[in-house]
């Protein structure tokens, strides 16, 4: 048995949810956390000093709904000089 994986790009995500809705959902997760209904693990941050870059990983889950997620964000500040975006990242959401 195989599970399917759905990959969405930025434009596809924007068609599904607005930034205003994202902010509302993030607030809701923190509200659930204050009630003990979600868990947000400590931020993992690593600075690549020799490469002038950094990486952040944020993750957590909502209890009782078998929904887990993470966001990984890389920052390459020198990309601006190359005409590239300084930030890139990925969000992953897992359910059962």
Segment roles from a protein language model:
Residues 2-96:
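N-terminal ligand-binding/catalytic initiation module
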């Amino acid at each position: 048995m195989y599970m399917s994986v759905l990959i969405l790009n930025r434009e596809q995500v924007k068609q599904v949810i607005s930034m205003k809705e994202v902010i509302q959902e993030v607030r809701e997760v923190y509200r659930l956390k204050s009630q003990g209904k979600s868990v947000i693990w400590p931020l993992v941050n690593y600075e690549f000093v020799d490469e002038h870059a950094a990486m952040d990983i944020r993750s957590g889950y909502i209890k009782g709904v078998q929904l887990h997620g993470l966001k990984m964000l890389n920052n390459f500040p020198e990309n601006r000089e190359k005409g590239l975006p300084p930030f890139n990242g990925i969000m992953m959401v897992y359910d059962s």
